[in-house]
């Protein structure tokens, strides 16, 4: 069990939480910090965002990242509107000769927001309060926060409070359901799942998974692979599936 705790701690430590800066009043703000090789997007209070973060062209010592939304944006340092008068599309630049890896952090704030990411530099996405659709396939860490959220990402998924649906992608991932009755789909890879409090439904998918049900009446399905399934307190249904499994109530 100590090895599992170490594994969980290692996964969380890769992309630490970042405090959200304050957005420009009335508009979401996106700006770059070349000293930190980072770009930060912060939604304005009361906005409902439909954000796309996309890679663009590269040249003259910089690469460009596009931020397209359904609401007006305010460009900060090293960022500008794609076209004059079009306030919903901002392009930011990062130098290509930095020793640091690119880091893009997105804070969506309140509202029922949506995001889709395809840029590989996305580090964290925080949905904030509201029922969010977070299709952040390239993001390392995705947090739904409060609300009934759809959460998708590359390494660490955290549903937060609410009835959330977490969907992993290929690879080894860490998935936390949080409080609420959650649906968690781990898919391929050696995944670690902690469903949290609530009546949760977990599907391990292919791979050797470790699944903790937590409190509540959970349904845990290891599916293919050599899985470890721990039900926790509550009236749980635990099924290992094909493979050499360890199941505990």
Across the structure, where does each feature detected by a protein language model lie?
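Secretory targeting and sorting signals
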Residues: 1-21
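Extracellular beta-strand repeat scaffolds in secreted/surface proteins
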Residues: 37-43, 61-67, 113-119, 133-138, ...
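A low-complexity, Ser/Thr/Gly/Pro-enriched, surface-exposed linker/loop concept
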Residues: 60-93
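Glycine-centered beta-turn/loop sites at beta-strand termini
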Residues: 108, 117-118, 127, 135-136, ...
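Consensus positions within tandem repeat domains that build extended binding/scaffold surfaces
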Residues: 112, 131, 148, 163, ...
């Amino acid at each position: 069990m100590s090895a599992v705790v170490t594994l969980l701690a290692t996964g969380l430590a890769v992309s630490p939480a970042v405090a959200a800066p304050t957005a420009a009043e009335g508009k979401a703000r996106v700006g770059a910090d070349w000293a930190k090789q980072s770009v930060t997007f912060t939604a304005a209070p009361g906005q409902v965002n439909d954000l796309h973060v996309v890679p663009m062209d590269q040249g003259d010592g910089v690469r460009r990242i596009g931020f397209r939304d359904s609401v007006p944006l305010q460009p900060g340092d090293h960022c500008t509107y794609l076209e004059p008068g079009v306030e919903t599309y901002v392009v930011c630049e990062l130098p290509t000769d930095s020793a640091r890896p690119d880091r893009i952090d997105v804070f969506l704030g309140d509202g029922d927001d949506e995001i889709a990411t395809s840029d590989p530099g996305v580090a964290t996405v925080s949905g904030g309060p509201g029922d969010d659709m977070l299709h952040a396939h390239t993001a390392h860490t995705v947090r739904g926060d409060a609300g009934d959220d759809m959460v998708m990402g590359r390494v660490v998924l955290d549903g937060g409070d609410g009835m959330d649906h977490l969907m992993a992608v290929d690879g080894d991932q860490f998935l936390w359901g949080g409080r609420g009755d959650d649906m968690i789909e781990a898919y391929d890879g050696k995944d670690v799942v902690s469903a949290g409090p609530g009546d949760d439904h977990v599907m391990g998918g292919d791979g050797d998974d470790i699944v903790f049900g937590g409190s509540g009446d959970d349904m845990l399905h290891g599916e293919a692979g050599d899985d470890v399934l721990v039900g926790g307190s509550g009236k749980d249904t635990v099924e290992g599936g094909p493979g050499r499994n360890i199941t505990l109530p």
